């Protein structure tokens, strides 16, 4: 499936009205002070935002904008309808807004799978490592997942976050096994995708690999255009709480060739849509044009 520029731009704009406003936007810091932050392109010192720095600088440089609003971090932005650039939107939250941008790309779009191996050389196993991330300890899906499957599959935490200090009674020391390399993941066929604060940072490179993602229907919208991923075509679907993981794995092991085909489709989705730098830059510029003018109709763009 090859996505057109129009499809992707419309997807990234999301909740925004394509004919959003008939006049240029009036960015009022008083209205948005408690929500995103504003980058003043004339003051480079304000560009310091941890892992987001290179992407923020790129967006500022690609368009003649004096100011751009960003909402960084992992909590979906739910503010007013201003064209704020965000990393993700939450489909479970109707108030989740923003124009999707390719933020924190160094983490989410490092597609280095140079150490990948052929499907038939991979272990017929499930493998997962990650931190116990999550803003809300009581909805932390990763803790439930490791608690349920630690004794059956090679799933464990690589690190404990601040949640461990606030609720240590939810954890077991044996669940912590330390950091694993990407190569460790790629030795296995079946790689679960578990959301953290927002989307899993591993989804993109796992799709690009010869392994197959096992995941619920995507909750978060991002630069990846998750709505265009099809269950049984690009990934193998499980229930949101992974309660049917073992049943799904039984099917996978009985349908090895179909699983390999799904893995190839995922890799093709990535290679066809997100690896051409000219296309990526063109789409970014189109989004910035929408923000600058406040009046943008993608159907009239060549």
Locations of the language-model features?
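Secretory-pathway glycan-assembly enzymes, especially type II membrane glycosyltransferases
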Residues: 1-181
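Catalytic binding pocket for nucleotide-activated donors in carbohydrate/polymer assembly enzymes
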Residues: 179-302
């Amino acid at each position: 499936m090859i996505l057109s520029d129009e499809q992707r731009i419309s997807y990234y704009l999301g909740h925004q009205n394509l004919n959003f406003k008939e006049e240029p936007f009036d960015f009022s810091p008083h209205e948005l002070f408690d929500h995103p932050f504003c980058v003043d392109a004339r003051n480079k010192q304000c560009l310091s935002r941890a892992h987001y720095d290179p992407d923020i600088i790129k967006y500022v440089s690609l368009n003649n904008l004096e100011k751009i609003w960003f909402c960084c971090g992992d909590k979906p932005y739910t503010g007013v309808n201003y064209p704020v650039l965000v990393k993700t939107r939450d489909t479970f939250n109707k108030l989740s807004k923003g124009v999707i941008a390719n933020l924190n790309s160094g983490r989410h779009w490092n597609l280095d799978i140079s150490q990948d191996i052929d499907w038939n050389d991979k272990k017929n196993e499930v493998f997962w490592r990650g931190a116990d991330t999550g803003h809300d300890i009581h909805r932390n899906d990763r803790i439930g997942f490791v608690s349920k499957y630690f004794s059956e599959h090679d799933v464990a935490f690589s690190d404990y976050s601040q949640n461990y200090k606030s609720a240590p009674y939810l954890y077991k020391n044996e669940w912590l096994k330390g950091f694993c390399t990407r190569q460790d993941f790629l030795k296995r066929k079946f790689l679960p995708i578990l959301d953290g604060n927002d989307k899993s940072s591993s989804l993109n490179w796992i799709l690009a690999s010869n392994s197959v993602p096992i995941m619920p229907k995507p909750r978060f919208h991002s630069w990846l255009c998750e709505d265009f991923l099809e269950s049984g075509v690009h990934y193998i679907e499980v229930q949101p709480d992974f309660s049917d993981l073992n049943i799904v794995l039984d099917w996978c092991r009985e349908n090895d060739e179909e699983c390999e085909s799904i893995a190839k489709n995922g890799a093709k989705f990535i290679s066809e849509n997100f690896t051409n730098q000219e296309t990526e830059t063109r789409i970014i510029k189109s989004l910035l044009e929408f923000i600058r003018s406040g009046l943008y109709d993608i159907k009239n763009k060549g």
